Amino acid sequence: MPKVEIQLNLGENDYDPQEFVNAAVYGEELGFRTAWFGDHIFPWFHSGKRSSFVWSMLSVALEKTDRMKVGPWVTVPIGARYHPAIVAQAAATLDNMYPGRVLLGVGSGEALNERPFWNGTWPKWDERIERLIEGIRLIRMMWDSKEPFKFEGKYFSSDFYHLYTKPRRKIPILFSAIGKRAARYAGIYADQLITICPRNDIQRMKEVILPAYRQGRLEANKTGRGGVAIEVNFSFLTPEEIVRSQWRTLGIYHKDSWSIPNPVAVEEEGRRVTVDEVRKGTHFCSRWSELVEVIEQYAKIGVTAVSLYTGADRKLMRAVARNVLSVF
């Protein structure tokens, strides 16, 4: 069986911050080596009434665990909610205290969390991805440069940048990509690719996403196939049961969810999400062995890590450890 790491995705909604931290601690006790935290100022649905600051939780989770690697899935250093220099400092400070245990997932963002910081506007994807690429370049320069430097970019410029507290180890940058162009950019500019399924199903991953990612790595003269982490959305309910009982949380299934500006509007969109949309966005299983088979298929085409969303649900975490983690 191909080697693949099973990781936890704790998310950012549904629970209080201490519960997320405790979940990371419990995950380590269960044998997981990596836990991802969502990075939102607003949750995906309004009535959940929770959304905690990820960098606060990451620091406490690192202190309370011994070996667990943690990071944001994903942060958005495009100059709105976060300037790249702030992200560089935040990640470097954590790695300085907890070397080798910090991951940095980055992406181009969604309107839900970023639009309020653009004075009511929302840049097109092309601009956001340019900002992300330039932001990654600035972050790396701040980590690596031993002397102050001048930076003149299209979006970020200053005659003085210098990071005084450096990371102790190289911090992996994981680039979130849903489409072909972003996957290629992940190969060029980042250390690893992260994506979601079944939006990117086996066939699309094999024929579109992974070839584009590897082409990018080739263009950047990188060796090896590169790490690929994928979040597998799964459920043991039926699509009909989810639409009936969990409609408040379903706005993210909407095809334009990345452009919806606030959690009240996202939640309202959940009323209009169809059974077919839910079916296309989730791997539905009747037994754990079916989920294991899905993960095996992704591993065979080159996926190196699979992130499973559990939130801080200890019962679900135990079930994942017993039925999935133990297999791999």
Where are these regions (language model features)?
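Active-site-adjacent structural elements that line small-molecule/cofactor binding pockets in enzymes
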Residues: M1-F328
